[in-house]
Amino acid sequence: MPTQHILIVEDEPVTRTKLLGYFKGEGYLVTAVGTAAEMEQVLEKEDIQLVLLDINLPDNNGLLLTRELRGHSSIGIILVTGKTDDIDKIVGLEVGADDYVTKPFNPRELLARVRNILSRVNAASSAEDSTKATYRFDGLEFDAPKRQVLGRDGSIIKLTRAEYELLMVFVGHHNQVLNRDRLMNKVTHRSWDPSDRTIDVLVMRLRKKLERDYKSPILFSTVHGEGYLFSGLTK
């Protein structure tokens, strides 16, 4: 497998240098920059598989950058934040980040998260090559290889990697109640923590994109005290 290329976007020089050295030592091809403008230049020229993106950059906001990236790319994104509250984390997931870490972080934990996402990137690419399934539900058509949904009005609804993976879990377990721990493990390969809202945020994102009325969902139902139920699949 070719060396995977990680882009570090961190304005703090010491942290940037440490991350650069650490991931190079783990065998990755690494580019490190300190601004959003530099990040955009690298992305235009290089084949990047994953971005470690600091939320607070001098020339832009990491959350806005994540939203922009997700508009045209399925690249892996891990947000790095210095805040301990959940707001940035939740918003980051809502706009399309794959994961997040809070400073100060353990480099080995960050490495594990990077490996996890890169393995998912590779798995998704392989799945796109081999998966031929199309799923239909409630007037929608989910094209798994293309990782997109044909809307009721004929428009194309694009899915982020995390949304795609969660939807694949749901269509593979139609009419089955899945608890958050099981969903978390299948989508992120981490155990669910009661304070972690990753799955709830992803389900809400799918509801907003796919339900007729996301406030009264019929496809992705909450089973109180247990988890979520996906129903309505016709193929």
Model regions: which residues?
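N-terminal/domain-start alpha-helical segments
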Residues: M1-S125
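Short, flexible helix-to-coil linker/hinge segments that flank and couple to helix-turn-helix
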Residues: L118-K132, A144-P145
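Short amphipathic alpha-helical recognition elements used for nucleic-acid or partner binding
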Residues: G154-R190, L206
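Short, positively charged loop/turn segments that connect secondary-structure elements
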Residues: R190-R197
